[in-house]
Amino acid sequence: MQFAVNYSLPLEELLRTGKVEVDLLKCPDWQGVIHAARRLRPVYVHFEIAVGNGKVPTLDYDVLRAMFTQTHTPHLNCHLIGNSTLDPGSRNDQLKQIREWVEELTFIRNNLPDVPLVAENLPITPLEKGSRIGADPDLIRETLLATETDLLFDLSHARISCGAMEYKLTDYVSQLPMQHLRELHLTGLRRYHGLITDHFELSDSDWQAADWAQQQILSGEWRQPEIVALEYGGVGDVFGWRTQPDALLAQVPRLQAMFGNHATSFSPPY
């Protein structure tokens, strides 16, 4: 199990001065960011691939293959997008959603047969009409088991979905294939522009959720993931403005102690 954090300039400074430590740096599929980050620590790429919107056949699979040779990316991630035309309460529509996901995941696997595949749960949000059917844990489980795809479990996404459904987190998670967990994402939640939003620093309730996740892993209820990533901070308009050095300094060492590979060493490729 390795601990990763979103690459950012404040995190780079903390790493260079030895104030924090991480096993991996999590990067978007942007060459400039990858080039900067890989001088600091091993890098893995988090792709913006969506499954369920019909665009999987248009992906540049040669570019994806190149990313794997350039980085320490252990698997190809994708995001399960719900079909906004389907009724979440209709079993026929649920089966149609599963078929759409299975078809696109199979297409990816046929083009990248040697690359492990993981799919991420997305949150329910009023901004995305298809998000409710897309966050259905039963449909996620059926799809992943049918395609031998592992789970990238975003804990904050699950917490947001549970709030929207008035569902207990433990009940929601019990319906997911946690024995196929390969990557775990952690963030803080905050109300922002009227909505519960992720990718903020962790507050007390977020730490409680992270502690619970750690216990599920230690007890064997969940498979031990290869990577646990703190999705706080980053680059660009979405993440750059909420990247505070003090928050990184307070959070990263604590999470590294909880989830990190303490035997990791790295020599930068100068």
Residue ranges of model-derived segments:
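C-terminal helical cap(s) of enzyme catalytic domains, especially alpha/beta-barrels
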Residues: F239-P269
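Active-site acidic/histidine proton-transfer and metal-coordination neighborhood
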Residues: T58-D150, I160, R242-A247
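N-terminal pre-domain/capping segments
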Residues: M1-F68
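A short secondary-structure junction signal
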Residues: E128-S131, L155-S156, C162-M165, I196
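Active-site-proximal loop/turn and secondary-structure-junction residues that shape catalytic pockets
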Residues: L9, D29-Q31, I49-V51, L80-S84, ...
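Alpha-helix-loop-beta-strand connector modules within alpha/beta enzyme cores
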Residues: L40-H46, W101-L112, R141-T147, Q208-G220
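Gly/Pro-rich active-site loop or hairpin
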Residues: G52-T58, G89-I98, S161-P225, G233, ...
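Hydrophobic faces of well-ordered beta-strands that scaffold small-molecule active sites
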Residues: M1-Y7, V20-C27, R41-F47, P74-C78, ...
